[in-house]
Amino acid sequence: METEQAPRPAEPPGDLTTAITAPGEQLLTLLDRHLPRIRAQAAPNDRDSTFPAATFHGFARDGVLGATVPAELGGMGVSRLHDVAVALLRVAEADASTALALHAQFSRGITLTYEWLHGPPPTRKLAERLLRAMARGEAVIGGAVKDHGRETTRLRPDGSGGWLLSGRKTLVTMAPIATHFVVSAQAPAAGGTTLLYAPIVARDTPGLSIVDGWTGLGMRASGTLDVAFDDCPVPAGNLLARGSVGAHSDAALAGQAVSSVAMLGIYVGVAQAARDLAVETMARRSATPPAASRTLVAETEARLYALRATASAALVNVDELSPRHDMDPDERGRRMMTPFQCAKVMVNQLAAAVVDDCLTVVGGATYAAEHPLARLSRDVRAGRFMQPYTYADGVDYLSAQALGLERDNNYVSLRATRPVDSR
């Protein structure tokens, strides 16, 4: 993503401990005010699957929800994904569900900023309007990507220049408070081509409904619900073009990497929180820790270092390549996505291993549902299901890159070509 800031090296490099820009430091300072409340509410919100709406109202008041909006539009101007990841890491140490929901808002600020800078005039106008509303704390924008069951979310012309949207999305994070949704949808075109669009739909649009009742294994307080669309009217100016199904264009990978790579910080934060709980528990015990427990603690320290270094390298890579619009678009997309996917595989594996070992160190008390390590053990597993890519799709992508195999790497397009019972 574009930036005029002069970043300085993190101290120590690759540690994901500090921000590298002044706006990033400002964001961390603001978040520090909210961390005690987030930490205190994590357990009851997880138990009851309650979204922390009051916390997000506080975020709106303090400007946190506009952190990734450019300063020219009233936002904080955090543009380095490294700094976004550090912020999410801090929040995830207190509560991963809150961090996941906040990521959805941060990601939208980043991607809409790109549309504002590089999109056609109608798109720039739409992006500016939404970004200014985000900066004021008035717009909370969720992403609705995954179709529910066998349904396919589709657009069709309304006969007067606009569109009608129908379908149902699942796993829509931050749905309880979202004012808008960016929806992945398909529309037929001449010649049998199927086009991909991202209509932006306001919550109060006729035909839109929030479907409550989701009970997840982890991230239970993230407000992850279903959203249904029944002939929702969408003005032509509220539509973002996203290519076509089966185009095999890797240029789309750049935007997908930019919008998702900072999420690595969430799972580093979960692993760090588990480590801290385990070490604090051992320190309170009067007996000298047994050799087996000390071995697990030592391995946890090494894994945490690897986690932070791996995630940091992927973030730096995306930050450096994001403004390189002089490159071949497909090559740029692959060079941003491939290190991200290598890091995602390792972060997901190592973070889960850290949490599992911390359960072993602390012992049987962690088997109680209310123990904080029990919550962390469920939350950390969400990473394997996040796009791009899920673990299975990530294996397909990385192995195809290594072996030179042809495939459609745009997961939105690829999903549209799969049989409905395998999505």
From Swiss-Prot:
EC number: 1.14.13.-
GO molecular function: acyl-CoA dehydrogenase activity; flavin adenine dinucleotide binding; monooxygenase activity
UniProt keyword terms in alphabetical order: Antibiotic biosynthesis, FAD, Flavoprotein, Monooxygenase, Oxidoreductase
Signal peptide from the UniProt entry: none
Cofactor field: FAD
Alphabetized Gene3D superfamilies for the sequence: Acyl-CoA dehydrogenase/oxidase, N-terminal domain, Butyryl-CoA Dehydrogenase, subunit A, domain 2, Butyryl-CoA Dehydrogenase, subunit A, domain 3
A Gene Ontology BP annotation from the UniProt entry: antibiotic biosynthetic process
InterPro entries linked to this entry: Acyl-CoA_Oxase/DH_mid-dom (IPR006091), Acyl-CoA_Oxase/DH_mid-dom_sf (IPR046373), AcylCo_DH-like_C (IPR036250), AcylCo_DH/oxidase_C (IPR009075), AcylCoA_DH/ox_N (IPR013786), AcylCoA_DH/ox_N_sf (IPR037069), AcylCoA_DH/oxidase_NM_dom_sf (IPR009100)
Domain of life: Bacteria
The protein's annotated pathway: Antibiotic biosynthesis
PANTHER family: ACYL-COA DEHYDROGENASE (PTHR43884), ACYL-COA DEHYDROGENASE YDBM-RELATED (PTHR43884:SF25)
Function: Nitrososynthase involved in the biosynthesis of rubradirin, an ansamycin antibiotic. In vitro, catalyzes the double-oxidation of TDP-L-epi-vancosamine to TDP-L-epi-vancosonitrose. In vivo, probably catalyzes the formation of D-rubranitrose, the nitro sugar moiety of rubradirin.
Family: Belongs to the acyl-CoA dehydrogenase family.
Identification of the protein by name: Amino sugar nitrososynthase RubN8
Gene for this chain: rubN8
